[in-house]
Amino acid sequence: YLFVMTNRMKLLNYSFEGLPNLKKLDEIMRQHPAVKRVLEQEGAPHTLTD
């Protein structure tokens, strides 16, 4: 669930400044092949207003 939140932070352009552990978690998760596949399958991000 934490990766979902860091992913949302990126989509909303929130800064990871002062949150080095969250930034590292996000970077590590994005390197996993399974996570890469899921993000590819999901396609382009959408917003609540789309």
Curated annotation (Swiss-Prot):
Please give the superkingdom of this protein's source: Bacteria
- Comment on activity versus temperature: Optimum temperature is 40 degrees Celsius.
The known regulators of its activity are described as: Inhibited by Fe(2+) and DTT. Slightly inhibited by SDS and Zn(2+). Activity is slightly increased by Mn(2+).
Query: Catalytic activity, per the record?
Result: RX + glutathione = an S-substituted glutathione + a halide anion + H(+)
InterPro entries attached to this UniProt entry: Glutathione-S-Trfase_C_sf
GO terms for molecular function, please? glutathione transferase activity
Q: Does the record bear Transferase in its keywords?
A: yes
Q: Is Transferase one of the keywords?
A: yes
Q: Which SUPFAM superfamilies match?
A: GST C-terminal domain-like (SSF47616)
Record EC number = 2.5.1.18
Q: How does activity depend on pH?
A: Optimum pH is 6.
Kindly state which keywords UniProt assigns to this record, in alphabetical order: Transferase
Q: What does this protein do?
A: Glutathione S-transferase, which conjugates reduced glutathione to a wide number of exogenous and endogenous hydrophobic electrophiles.
| Family classification | Belongs to the GST superfamily.
Q: What is this protein called?
A: Glutathione S-transferase
Q: What is the lineage of its organism?
A: Bacteria, Bacillati, Bacillota, Bacilli, Lactobacillales
